Structures are given as structure tokens and as C-alpha cells.
Design a protein with these regions (language model features):
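Pyridoxal 5′-phosphate
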Residues: 1-329
């Protein structure tokens, strides 16, 4: 286990003692947010986050609000990035946590983590948590100035049920699972060696081949954008500088669920909102960017990977054309 942990730490540019094994990013997010805030009671109870976060972050923040914490959401710009000036305005002496996703799961927007970390240098009692679930293998990870970072191995072809929390070694957080600490005092329970080995292998493959994989996916994304832009009712929600693995769009006048179901009849799988969102509600991420409820309800997401082929894109475009003619005309 020590050798595997050393390997994971080396790949991430972290120290072995900064690696905490969890059951997934949802647990990692809960451990980081609740652990940081509970350990910072003597400083304050003010938290800053965004409307773009995964439901495990939103759920943890709601639980902390019930315990007396105050949560402010920083404004989102039209390109999907956070408004850094608004962040500066929201920061207070009693702010103990800023929680931001590195890459938004619905739009693919890459947040300016380094700039955020630089701003927080003037607030030594405030910790920065980054949910990097959608970032590994898709963009460069920024650990400098980050106190905790959640990682979900199944997003880069590791196993479901495994997760990581990278925690700065001098940071003290409150554990959420109590008992005998096996590899860390911050998360009780003995990690599964097989799971840990799968994380290291998947992480190594993702990072060693990252540039080639990104270039392949970017070419497919450009092809999709060029072809889908020919349809007058198509509106792209993902910004141009998003990670190419995620392409969020809306077809005006057609609910995203309708398109999802019609494409599903042709064995094409697309997503409406994030997988862990409440069914029947609009996409908070798309609404935060577009400020348009109808557009948010019409949105859906295409996910690409280095395993996606041009032939699959061509087949998708043929199926999309049939669905568009049936639903949008």
C-alpha cells in the first residue's frame, strides 16, 4: 500500500501523507468541506462557493447551513468562469472556505484556480477546496495554493467506489468517520489495496497520454461544433475554451429530456444535467451562464473521450439530423 500511495503522490506532485483514500468524490467533497469548516469554528462560519458545483458539494453546504454557516455564491460570467472581482467583494475576515470545481461537469468550463489561490493568499484563515473530478486527464491540475482536492478515479477509467482527497499535510480537518485510523487519522477504515492499485494505474495512463488524448478529443469537438452549428435552433452552452470532452448545447423549443429520449431510441446516450442532479429540474450550470430558464431546460450534454471515433461522430450526426427534423421542425 505504501508503494502504491508513493506512486499516486508522485503522479500528482503531492506528498504521500497528503493522500487520503475515500469511496469516491462525493465522500471526498463531504470530508473536505465539513472537515475544514468544523475545524475552523474559532475563525468563522462564512463559506463561498458557486452554482456550478456537484450535488455532493451543494448537499454538504446545505448541511453546514443547517449548522449555522453562511454560504454566498460568487457570480458566474458569461463564459462560465467565476467573477474574480465579485469573489474579492464576498471575502471577509470570517470566511473559512472557498469551494470551487476545477472543471464544471455540465459545461466543461475551466476555472482560474491559480488566480483564485493567489487572491486567497491575503486571507490566511480561508481554505481553498477544489473538486477536480472532471479535470484529471482533461486539463493541467493546479495544486499550488490548494488546500484540498477531490478526485474521482472512475472519471479516468478507474473503478467505481474509489476516490481520493489530496489534503495539504499541514492542514488539520475534522474526520467524518471515527475509529481507528489505518493510513490516516482523517479517514478511518482500511483502504482496499486493489482499489488503490487501480487508481495508480488509471492515473498513470491518463497523465502519461494526456496531450495525445486531448488533441484527439479536441478534433472531434471541433467537428461536432462545425456540423451542429449548421442547425438554426442549436445553441452551444459550453464556452470555446471548455475542455473538449464536454459539449453542452440546447435546441431551442425542445426540452433536453425529449432529445435525450429520442436519441436513446437510437442507442445514443447523452446527459441532461449532471448524473447526480434532481430529476425534473433545470440545469443550474446552464442557467447560471445563460440566465434563460427555457434554454436551461432545453440543454443536454455530449460526452467525448479518447476512445470516441470519427465514425461514431458521423453516425451520431446522422441520428441527430433525424431527431432534429422530428422534434424541432
Amino acid at each position: 500500500m505504501a508503494r502504491v500511495t508513493d506512486g499516486i503522490a508522485e503522479l500528482l506532485g503531492a506528498a504521500p501523507e497528503e493522500i487520503i483514500y475515500t469511496s469516491g468524490a462525493s465522500e471526498s467533497n463531504n470530508l473536505a468541506l465539513k472537515g475544514i469548516v468544523q475545524a475552523s469554528r474559532h475563525v468563522g462560519k462564512h463559506i463561498i462557493s458557486t452554482a456550478l458545483e456537484h450535488s455532493s458539494v451543494g448537499g454538504a453546504l446545505s448541511a453546514l447551513q443547517q449548522q449555522g454557516c453562511e454560504v454566498d455564491l460568487v457570480d458566474i460570467r458569461r463564459d462560465g468562469t467565476i467573477d474574480l472581482e465579485h469573489l474579492r467583494e464576498l471575502l471577509r475576515k470570517d470566511t473559512v472556505l472557498v469551494a470551487i470545481c476545477a472543471v464544471d461537469s455540465e459545461l466543461g468550463t475551466v476555472q482560474p484556480i491559480q488566480e483564485i489561490a493567489d487572491i486567497l493568499r491575503d486571507y490566511p484563515n480561508c481554505r481553498l477546496h477544489v473538486d477536480a473530478t472532471q479535470a484529471v486527464g482533461k486539463t493541467k491540475l493546479v495544486l499550488s495554493g490548494v488546500d484540498t482536492m477531490s478526485i474521482a478515479p472512475h472519471k479516468f477509467y478507474g473503478l467505481n467506489g474509489s476516490g481520493l482527497l489530496v489534503k495539504k499535510k499541514d492542514l488539520v480537518i475534522e474526520p467524518q468517520i471515527h475509529g481507528g485510523g489505518s493510513t490516516t487519522p482523517y479517514r478511518s477504515g482500511t483502504p482496499a489495496l486493489g482499489m488503490a492499485m487501480s487508481i495508480e494505474k488509471a492515473l498513470r495512463l491518463a497523465l502519461e497520454n494526456q496531450n495525445e488524448r486531448i488533441a484527439h478529443v479536441a478534433a472531434l469537438n471541433r467537428l461536432l461544433r462545425a456540423e451542429l452549428a449548421k442547425y438554426p435552433k442549436v445553441r452551444f452552452n459550453s464556452p470555446e475554451n471548455a475542455v473538449p470532452h464536454i459539449l453542452n448545447l440546447s435546441v431551442n423549443g425542445v426540452k433536453g429530456t425529449a432529445f435525450q429520449q429520442e436519441l436513446g431510441k437510437n442507442d445514443v446516450c447523452v446527459s441532461v444535467k449532471s448524473a447526480c442532479s434532481v430529476e425534473g429540474t433545470l440545469s443550474k450550470a446552464v442557467y447560471a451562464v445563460s440566465r434563460d430558464q427555457k434554454n436551461a431546460l432545453s440543454s443536454w450534454r455530449i460526452s467525448l473521450s479518447h476512445l470516441t471515433t470519427e465514425a461514431e461522430i458521423a453516425e451520431f450526426l446522422q441520428i441527430f439530423d433525424r431527431c432534429y427534423r422530428e422534434l424541432a421542425q
